[in-house]
């Protein structure tokens, strides 16, 4: 009698929608393609030091309500024109959430917030939102966590991120080497910048790895390498790394590795000591460095939503509209002065030559 040696801990399989079917249902339009391409090209120029503006990735910690996300997008779009000479604003649109242990893994994994894990619907909802944003002329940025999800939506993403928990992962470095947009790698949760530097070096090179095609067929993927990757300083469990000394040390390390000196600073997470109320202060300190002439800082990240703070998921209590269910965010009204301060810093740096 044979022993069970395969799938011993698998409790079921469900069909996954092939990427090509979703792209047929919700196709990239000409207008959307212009939004995405413009965002990518401008971000690349900023990362390469050919554009002196700041790249600002701003938006909710995670997306759980597309109606609120679109309302936030409309607010953001209303300030873009007045700031576009100094800032390239990309909306943070995160559909996948890495968890330290367990918890809600994001809109793609559980779009109904009820443990039904309707992933096909989650992918469809995510792509529809990205299309809506692109049609508004607003480029989007997201974290790539699952290495298959780019096939469903990467054509609508202007800037991508690899999180602190996955920067050291070989498959994420390989994936980044084939992504069509600039990609930021965060320093590790322990504060190590070297793993992000190593990741950028790896992602610049061609790779060959296992993945799936748009038709959902298993394939060996060969990539060309991604020349537009950069470090994201996000602080760590032991404290911030957005101050001038840490920025200088990171820029020197990336330069020594032959990767340029440009980096982006996350004003949340370890840099805010996990207190959203500190984000404006962190952004102000970063702005001061920019105004003083620092040219290694090419951008910032902000976690911002319609309503300040965060809330817990509970079936017994209705969710507050426009408030995060993951990390706490600053409110929209708190966000606008931060954006204005960053824009003023760029003008000051520009004026100083």
Positions of predicted regions on the chain:
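Active-site-facing alpha/beta catalytic cores
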Residues: 2-6, 73, 86-247, 269-270, ...
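N- or domain-start disorder-to-order transition segments that initiate the globular core
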Residues: 7-47
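Acidic (Asp/Glu)-rich catalytic clusters
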Residues: 47-50, 80-84, 128-137, 223, ...
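Conserved, mostly hydrophobic/aromatic
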Residues: 59, 265, 331
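A contiguous, surface-oriented mixed alpha/beta subdomain in the mid-to-C-terminal portion of proteins
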Residues: 234-236, 241, 249-264
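Internal helix-turn-beta structural module
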Residues: 305-350
